[in-house]
Amino acid sequence: MGEFTTPTPGPVTHPTLVFEEYDLPNGLHVILCPSHSVPLVSLNLWYHVGSKDEDPKRTGFAHLFEHMMFQGSKHVKKAEHFRYVQNVGGTLNATTNQDRTNYFEILPSSELELAMWLESDRMMALEVTEENFENQRAVVKEERRQRYDNQPYGTVYENLLLRVFPTSGYHWSTIGSMQHLDETEIHEVQAFHKQFYHPNNASLCLVGDFKRDEAMRLIDRYFGVIPAGPAIARHPQVIEPIGKQVRHVMYDNVQLPAVYVAFQSAHAYSEDEYKLDIVSDVLSKGRSSRLYRELVYKQRIAKEVNCYNLSNEKAGMFMLSGIAQIGIDIERVEEALWMELAKMRADLADAQELQKVKNKFEAGYVRSLTEVGSRADHLQRAWTFKRNASLANGELQKLLDVTAEQAREAAIRYLTPEKAVVIHVLPKAMEPSSTDKS
């Protein structure tokens, strides 16, 4: 019998997005990323407009247009966009955040032209009418009631943004203000549409099973004829650092008290984004993470804990939270959160702990690259925020390269008590009466 030897593992290689990009004369940026593993194609269209680009006195417009875009265009009647796509076995949706609005279809590759026609028609000739506006204003107001105003802890995020980013467009949420929705007139909505929804403020990404030359021909046919829009004057985003701790108490329709601690963090594609991602995952990724292990299992003072780092185009927010167990003072939960942050600043994460969070991130990232829509989002985010789609191929390695010392250093620089916004959410039954306040 021959001698058995264990092969030496070689360097790990990760999937790479192979793509090309170009601009149409009207300013539309195009990214082509072919993949023939499955007979599907994703058309992913990003408009570089989010809630931060709105007038502070007229918030919620970017999200409003997430709805308005399905209300009909010159050749597509109201709600027909859904019917066309679903009738050929496709899916579609739209999302809005503080920096961009995303519209996408995933269809059988034989139906690529259908997606081109639908998206180009509403880019060229969306029906921004009084009737459509009134209809969708009512829909958005109801969405706000259900997802924010009538949801336990539903308005905490808005209150955090207001205090973490008091001087920039990041200080309101995408859903916008109910008052602003009520006061808005149709001419203001039309002006917002004219300002932002045109080829030179958009990027189109195709991912999946398509032929390059045919795709380029269709893009030119359907999008090349759309005229460019006006040059965009954006509101400057002034991110004033938090000089001392800000505290706030909210009384809400909740059963259990909660505490939220938030900090300004790093913007997208900065080196610190990846360091703070590691910190947040060490603290809360999985049930063996530090916050779960200490507050939920060991001390049994929290029913639920959470932590994340959200890096946007111009700024970021790092947030951690805990919901108290029955009978536990929320001050104990806050103190425990601060203790875990102090440990992050004082001590290095051990090698096993660090590798575990990296493994989870790596698995999730590689899994996302198996989906045509996720691949498009990776490329679009890099292009829209940094005008460099190639950054999408370096993100995973940047995170895997973060050392325990770099993570600790980021925690020291960003996550200190004097830079925090702290919100306690208490049951309304705990609110002092008017007599107590006097």
What label would you give each PLM region?
Residues 50-58:
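Short pre-active-site segment immediately N-terminal to the catalytic Zn-binding motif
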Residues 117-122, 217-223, 333-338:
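Short amphipathic alpha-helices in soluble, non-transmembrane regions
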Residues 71-76, 123-131, 347-350:
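Short, polar/flexible loop-turn hinges at active-site or ligand-entry regions and domain interfaces
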Residues 1-51, 75-111, 147-201, 225-270, ...:
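Non-catalytic beta-strand/loop surface segments
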Residues 59-73:
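Active-site SXXK
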Residues 216-232, 345:
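Glycine-centered hinge/linker elements that transmit conformational signals in sensory
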